[in-house]
Every structure is written in C-alpha cells, then in structure tokens.
Design a protein with these regions (language model features):
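Non-transmembrane, membrane-adjacent beta-strand/coil modules in membrane-associated proteins
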Residues: 31-97
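Generic structural detector for well-ordered beta-strands
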Residues: 22, 29-31, 39-41, 102-104
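Non-cytosolic head/periplasmic domains of membrane-anchored proteins
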Residues: 92-121
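Short, structured coil/loop segments at alpha-helix boundaries
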Residues: 1, 33-34, 107
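Short, flexible active-site loop motifs that bind/organize anionic cofactors or intermediates
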Residues: 18, 35, 101
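Alpha-helical transmembrane spans
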Residues: 1-18
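Alpha-helical transmembrane signal-anchor/signal-peptide segments
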Residues: 14-28
Length: 121
C-alpha cells in the first residue's frame, strides 16, 4: 500500500513542476517534469546560431505540451534535441559532437541574452 502512495505522490509533485533551463558550471541544464535532466557542456558547443524561424515536425521521444516541447523532434536540421516554448519565435541552434540542439527561453529577449551568454563563454 505504501509503494503506490509514494508513486502517486511523486507523480503529483512532478506534474506541478514547470520546465526550466539554467546555466551552471559551464553547462546548460534543462529540467522537464517526469523526464531526466539532460546537460549540455557549453565548451562542447559548436556552430551556434540565433534564429527567428524553425520548422518543428514530429516528436520522436520526449514531452510535448502547449508551452514546452522537450526531447528529440524532427526539424529542418534533421532530428534535434529540443527544449523550447513553441510560442516564442526566437531559437538558439547549435551542434555538439553527438547532437543537434535547439533551445529557447522565457521570451525573445531572454533567448537573445542566453545566446550571447553561451556564445561568450
């Protein structure tokens, strides 16, 4: 009886959490409810671009809500790890050795600030 109660309590707690992104110790850390927290080492980023328009296709694996897409999705760049609010039309695209990534932040202005921060580290 105790195990199911703990599982339900954990799911309720996780469902109330909001997606978040932060930079800490030269890493981009994404946090999505009920998902692992992937980290991207900033010194491994190459080919970084700030974009106004991106075509997002089907979800391969991940999370898709009205205000947050996170996981692997088809894009105009191929399959990318994305962490975006689809209602914000400013995106940071970059590549690492293993992945193509697409992220944005709370607003177009905050996304541009995040881009400048990443670019200058």
């Amino acid at each position: 009886i105790l195990i199911p109660i703990l599982i339900v309590t954990s799911l309720i707690k996780d469902s109330n959490q909001k997606p978040a992104i932060k930079i800490k110790d030269n890493e981009i850390i994404t946090s999505v409810p009920n998902c692992s927290e992937p980290t991207i080492k900033i010194d491994k980023i190459r080919n970084i671009k700030l974009l106004d328009n991106v075509e997002i296709g089907n979800k391969q694996v991940g999370y898709k809500e009205d205000k947050c897409y996170a996981g692997y999705f088809d894009t105009q760049f191929g399959t990318c790890f994305i962490y975006i609010n689809p209602n914000i039309h400013s995106y940071i695209y970059f590549e690492t050795k293993d992945d193509k990534c697409l992220i944005n932040y709370e607003s177009e202005e905050k996304t541009k600030e995040l881009y400048e921060t990443i670019k200058n580290i």
